[in-house]
Amino acid sequence: MSEAPGEAWPWWKESVFYHIYPRSFCLADPDGRRQRLGLPQDQGVAGASDHGVAGASDRVRDGAGDLEGIRRHLDHLVWLGVDALWLSPFYSSPMKDFGYDVADYCAVDPLFGSGADFDRLLAESHDRGLRVIVDFVPNHTSDQHPWFLDARSSRLAEHRDFYVWRDPDPEDAARPPNNWRRSFGEGPAWTFEETTAQWYLHLFLPEQPDLDWSNPAVVDAMEAVLGHWLERGVDGFRIDVVHALGKDPALPDAPAEVAAIPWSALNDDERTHPILRRLRSFVDAWPQEPVTVGEVFLIKTALVAKYYGDDDELHLAFNFPPMFCPFEAGCFKRRVAEIEQLLAPKAAWPTWVLSNHDRPRHRTRYGGSERRARAAAVMLLGMRGTPFLYAGEELGLEDALVPDELVVDPGGRDGCRAPIPWDSSSDHGWALGGADPWLPFPPEAAHRNVATLAADPSSILQLYRQLLALRREAAAVRKGAAELLESPDDVLAVRRTAHADECFVLVNFSAAPITWGPPAAEALLVLISSAGEGALSTPGSPYEGALGPEEAVIVRRA
C-alpha cells in the first residue's frame, strides 16, 4: 500500500530511525558525572551506586557513554541524514540489565546525566529537525523500584497487587507455580520471597519483577509515565517486550515441546490487545503525533501482525524474522512475501531492522563481509516500511571480541554493544583520559571510525548517507507500494511504485556475477550501487542488466 493523492502521511512512515544505546555512543562529560554522584573530580564513580554487574570493574561505570555525548554528535546525525532517534533506557536503575530494570521511570540516572541534560538534548534535537522517541519498559520494574520495595514488604502492602504473586505448592513448597523459564541465564521465571512466603513472577532476571497489567491501577500508573515524557516533548516510545504484558491468570504450564524456551519468547495472550488499545488512545491525543513502536519478539510475521490491531494498537511493530535470515535470497524473499501478504491488507506499515542491542551485528552474522553489509544496507533502506538503523552499522562495525575477564552481560550481548569509535585517537573520541571504556572498542576501530570513513567518499558510511538522501528524493523508495518479482534463485527483486515514480531494488546474494533485469522493463537508470568503485552498475548510468557478486542496486525507470 502506498500513499493516495491527498492522503495525510504520518511522519513516522517516512522517517528513518537511528537507535542509540547511550552507554555505547559517546562519553563527553566525565566531570559532570562525578559531580552528579558527589565524588571528587579525581575519583571514579566506583562505589557511588551499583551501575554495573557484580564483579565487573569500575570501567563499566566510568567508561560508559552519557547524554552529553549524544548531544555533541547531533550535527553528525543530521549530516548522515536520519530523521529520528530512539534512545535506549537512561532512567534511574541499578543496571542489572543495563537500564531495562527501571527504578524510577521519570528520573534520569546520574550515570547518564540529569533531567536538564535530557531536556537540552531533546530541545537541540528538535531544533535540528530530529524527532526523539524513548524506551518504555512496561512489563517489569527493577526490584529496587519503590513499588516493589513496598510490595515485597507485606501481603497487605499498597502496591502488592502491582506484581504477580502465587502461594507455594502445599505439597512441594520448593516447586515454582508453573514451568515457565526466564530469559538471561538458567532457571525458572519465579523467585520465592521469604518475607511474605510467596513466589513472584519475572520473565527476565529475578531483579526484574513483572507488573500485573490486569490491575487497573498499574495501567493508570504506567499511563502517567507516558504522560510525563510526552509532556516533556518526546515524539513517541519504543515499547519493550510488549507482547508479554497480558498473561493468562491461570498461569498454565508451557507445553512440553517448548518448555525449555523462555516464556518471554512465547507469551502471546489476547489480554495484551485491550491494554494496547488503551495506551494507543492515550498517546494519540497528544499534539506531537507520537508514535508507538512495539518490540514483538515472537519471530513470526503472522503473530507480529496482530499487534497492529485494526489500526488501534501499535503504530509500528518490530518484525524480527528478517533479522534471523542468513545471507541468502530465499529467506529474504519469503520474509518480503509474508510482510506484503499479512500486513498490507490491514494497512499495517512494516518496519525493517537488521541489527540492535540484543543481537549480533548483521555484518558479523554475515561472516564479517563488508561487501555483504553494504548490500544489506541497500536492501534495508530500499524495502517498504520504516527502517531502524543501529548506531555503528553505518560504519560497517562487527561485534567486539570480549575476553572472558571483561564480559559484563550474562545474556551474551556485549559484542554488539561495543563503543562507537569517533576517530582514530587512542580513546576514539571518548573522554576517557586514558582509562578503559565500559567494553572494548570493536575490531578495526583504528580505521573504521566516523572521522576516517566520513573523509572517504567510497566508504560504507558514505553509502549510508547516499541511501538516506535517495530515500528523501525518491517517493517510490520512501513510501511506495512494494511488489516481490519473480527472479533467479540468488536475486531478491522488489518493485517500488508511488504514482509516477517507479524503482526496483535488486540484490544479488551470490558470490558470482549475475545477468538479470526486471522483466519487460524499459530503460532503467542506476540510482545507487552497494559495490562502490568498480561496480558493474555505475550510479547515473543505464542499468545494463548485470549485478556483481553480492551487489545490490536501486534502479529507476528512465
Which positions does each model-derived feature cover?
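Surface-exposed beta-strand/loop patches in extracellular or lumenal glycoproteins
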Residues: 509-521
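Loop/helix patches that line or flank the sugar-binding groove of alpha-linked glycan CAZymes
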Residues: 11-13, 34-41, 62, 256, ...
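Solvent-exposed beta-hairpin/edge-strand motifs
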Residues: 519-532
